């Protein structure tokens, strides 16, 4: 199967994402301590309840305030092994920060929990010399994880800490899933995601890149050779509209386009003065903001309903509008228009309007990977292509196979994928008869 367990080659400095700066820069030590000391350390902290992984937020903030940054990072990463990327990509405005009691007073801003979490974890990754966690003695159990996105990495990390030999199979040359290939660069560059992958590797996880399950290794072989298998392959290719003129240069899936922006050396937007993004979710908003931040003069989002119907977060859309993105409501694409040379010139709408563009990005969803899941004996998928599994344990119809993340939910948050992976790790440990240590990070956070 030609696996490559080595870390990927360094990323090129000529990647277009390098032009996009942090929207929320890393705190300095003084800024972090000052912000931490505003926290009221609520006894029944609503921020903890609002965190899908149940990080003990008041405790990690208190440790920052007292200068114990390594201890702060340990609190965070116990409950959420991907707490670094979650600090940068979570919609904290509707999770922990949105639940902060300061919001009720309207006099002071809420605690910037995400930025404090980033400060603690990034500082620990950069400056920490002592390991954050100890690993249990090897117990002879072997687990395979399919995909290297947040759900699989979380599951793999927690299991490795309890002495299991965990191998992650990733079809791409670069691991990390959408954290590496799909996160808006103004939230996190690919280097940040890969630093977190290195942290997971350091827990004892083997990551084999360039190995596609179903092509290079048979699913039935994984089930036979490993004591348990975790399916966290994420989602597939961008969905298409299926309208005239769609095939050809200038029209691309938003997820695939962002991957080029983040990873492809020398990728540029030469000649693009008018761009449209079709869709109303968070992927569409991120893509539109990226285009605006890269200097495209006219960026428009086309959405088939109204702003009130959009699935994207309102606070993200507000930022997009402030950055110059125009939202066009009730815009139903009918066809793409091209000149005699095949170059994209615009998009015709069902109501007769035409929007000029040299670039159109489709952010209308992604394919499910049901065909891959069906290759695992005993694993079923529903009519939409999602894997069928117990929501509490992640166990599928095959008692040796567990699942989670976007392949199970259809696409949610990084932090919910991490929680899926953590739940499944607990279930796998129990199914394999592994006694989890009392002080194991696997016990931290929400059940």
Over which residues does each language-model region extend?
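Feature captures the FAD/FMN-dependent oxidoreductase FAD-binding
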Residues: 137, 142-146, 194-243, 335-346, ...
């Amino acid at each position: 199967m030609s696996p490559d367990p080595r870390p990927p080659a360094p990323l090129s400095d000529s990647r277009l994402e390098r032009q996009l700066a942090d929207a929320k820069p890393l705190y300095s030590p003084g800024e972090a301590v000052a912000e931490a000391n505003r926290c009221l350390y609520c006894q029944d902290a609503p921020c903890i309840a609002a965190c899908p992984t149940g990080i003990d937020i008041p405790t990690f903030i208190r440790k920052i305030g007292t200068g114990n940054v390594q201890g702060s990072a340990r609190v965070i990463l116990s409950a959420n092994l991907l707490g670094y990327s979650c600090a940068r990509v979570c919609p904290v405005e509707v999770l922990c920060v949105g639940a902060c009691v300061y919001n009720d007073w309207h006099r002071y801003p809420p605690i910037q929990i995400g930025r404090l979490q980033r400060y603690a974890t990034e500082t620990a990754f950069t400056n920490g010399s002592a390991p954050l966690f100890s690993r249990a003695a090897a117990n002879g159990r072997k687990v395979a994880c399919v995909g290297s996105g947040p759900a699989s990495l979380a599951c793999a990390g927690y299991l490795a800490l309890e002495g299991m030999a965990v191998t992650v199979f990733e079809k791409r040359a670069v691991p990390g899933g959408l954290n590496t290939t799909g996160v808006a660069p103004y939230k996190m560059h690919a280097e940040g995601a890969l630093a977190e992958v290195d942290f997971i590797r350091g827990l004892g996880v083997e990551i084999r890149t360039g190995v596609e399950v179903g092509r290079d290794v048979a699913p039935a072989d994984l089930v036979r050779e490993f004591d348990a298998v975790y399916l966290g392959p994420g989602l597939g290719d961008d969905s298409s509209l299926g309208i005239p003129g769609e095939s050809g240069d200038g029209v691309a899936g938003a997820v695939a386009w962002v991957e080029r922006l983040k990873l492809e050396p020398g990728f540029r937007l030469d000649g693009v003065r008018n761009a449209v993004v079709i869709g109303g979710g968070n992927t569409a908003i991120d893509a539109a903001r990226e285009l605006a931040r890269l200097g495209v003069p006219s960026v428009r989002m086309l959405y088939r309903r109204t702003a009130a119907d959009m699935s994207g977060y309102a606070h993200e859309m507000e930022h997009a509008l402030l950055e110059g993105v125009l939202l066009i409501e009730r815009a139903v694409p009918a066809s793409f228009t091209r000149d005699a040379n095949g170059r994209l010139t615009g998009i015709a709408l069902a109501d007769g309007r035409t929007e000029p563009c040299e670039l159109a990005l489709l952010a209308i969803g992604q394919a499910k990977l049901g065909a891959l899941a069906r290759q695992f004996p005993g694993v079923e998928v529903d009519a939409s292509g999602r894997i069928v599994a117990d929501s509490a344990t992640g166990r599928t119809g095959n008692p040796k196979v567990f699942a989670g993340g976007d392949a199970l939910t259809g696409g949610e948050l990084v932090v919910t994928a991490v929680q899926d992976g953590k739940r499944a790790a607990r279930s796998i440990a129990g199914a394999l008869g592994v006694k989890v240590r009392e002080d194991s990070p696997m016990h931290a956070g929400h059940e």
